[in-house]
């Protein structure tokens, strides 16, 4: 099967994100080499991937047109980084979120790759200008930040280094679409990229509302899961504005003054105090106790919900 693969992709790091990338690329027909410095880590990752893909097959949620065995045959482990990158068209780094560790990995890769392979990082917050600083192949470098869990949530943020070649962005965008993901282009780097800036803005105000006793933690979550989240699963905040009036200009004419009035009441960045954290944790634990067993079960339920939502979205999305 590997001989007829769409191309060779290397995953550096065999944790949760690395395994998810491996499954996604295999679903698109790519040969996948999973690299890790620990041979046992690779063995564990391959076994976890097999179990996960079997479960996906049973649930009817396996991505791609290939069978589970065909996809599994495309994924292999490699403990030697030089051997792993041989013949690769794309390298996806997935090591822990540590700038110096990632820079060390990219420096090593930079010294052994050719001028055609794309070097991509899964970082959620490290700036490309720092991550890829000093690399010879900087024009081939890009951040491709997935959303956890990547197999069920398709968005990928593409964030270039200031010297990244436009062709690198275009190739990465096309590759993400080929494996069924939904890439978006961040035009220039900014702390937190786009997704986390929006997420942190929500968390900041949510924390403040709970801390000031305006709403309970559980009711705060209801506002998202049964309110805003229902809309945002299908349309974003800007299209919501557009549809909630006779277009965007009409919305701004009607509501901009009211929005500014409310926004002026927002306070400073919360301190995320221990006292409030304990209050929120107590409320959360009433729903999901924070022991490994209950957390794992809730994550599995979340992933099943996301799978079903993805199926629904594929059925109702406008052409």
Swiss-Prot record:
EC category: oxidoreductase
Modified residue annotations for Phosphoserine: 3, 111
Subcellular location: Cytoplasm
Species of the source: Pongo abelii
Protein's name according to its UniProt entry: Lambda-crystallin homolog
One cellular component term from this protein's GO annotations in UniProt: cytosol
Bridged cysteine pairs (disulfide): none
Protein's UniProt keywords contain Acetylation: yes
Main localisation: cytoplasm
Binding sites annotated in the UniProt record for NAD(+): 16-17, 36, 97, 102
Catalytic reaction list: L-gulonate + NAD(+) = 3-dehydro-L-gulonate + NADH + H(+)
Taxonomic placement: Eukaryota, Metazoa, Chordata, Craniata, Vertebrata
């Amino acid at each position: 099967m590997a001989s007829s693969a769409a191309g060779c992709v290397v995953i550096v790091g065999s944790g949760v994100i690395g395994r998810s990338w491996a499954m996604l690329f295999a679903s698109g027909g790519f040969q996948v080499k999973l690299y890790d410095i620990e041979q046992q880590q690779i063995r564990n990752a391959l076994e976890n991937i097999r179990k996960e893909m079997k479960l996906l097959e049973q649930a009817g949620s396996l991505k791609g047109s290939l069978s589970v065995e065909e996809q599994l045959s495309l994924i292999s482990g490699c403990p030697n980084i030089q051997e792993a990158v041989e013949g690769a068209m794309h390298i996806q780094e997935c090591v822990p979120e540590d700038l110096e560790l990632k820079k060390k990995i990219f420096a090593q890769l930079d010294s052994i790759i050719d001028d055609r392979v794309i070097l991509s990082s899964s970082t959620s917050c490290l700036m490309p200008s720092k991550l890829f600083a000093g690399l010879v192949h900087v024009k081939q470098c890009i951040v491709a930040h997935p959303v956890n869990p990547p197999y069920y949530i398709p968005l990928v943020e593409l964030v270039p280094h200031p010297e990244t070649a436009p062709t690198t962005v275009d190739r990465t965008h096309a590759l993400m679409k080929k494996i069924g993901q939904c890439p978006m282009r961040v035009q220039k780097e900014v702390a937190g990229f786009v997704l986390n800036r929006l997420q942190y803005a929500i968390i900041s105000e949510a924390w403040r509302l709970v801390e000031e006793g305006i709403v309970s933690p559980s009711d705060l979550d209801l506002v998202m899961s049964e309110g805003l989240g229902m809309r945002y699963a299908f349309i974003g905040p800007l299209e919501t504005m557009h549809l909630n009036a006779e277009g965007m200009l009409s919305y701004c004419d009607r509501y901009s003054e009211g929005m500014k009035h409310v926004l002026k009441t927002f306070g400073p960045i919360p301190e995320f105090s221990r006292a409030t954290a304990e209050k929120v944790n107590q409320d959360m634990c009433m729903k999901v106790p924070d022991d490994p067993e209950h957390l794992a079960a809730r994550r599995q339920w979340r992933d099943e919900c996301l799978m079903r939502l993805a199926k629904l979205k594929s059925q109702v999305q406008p052409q």
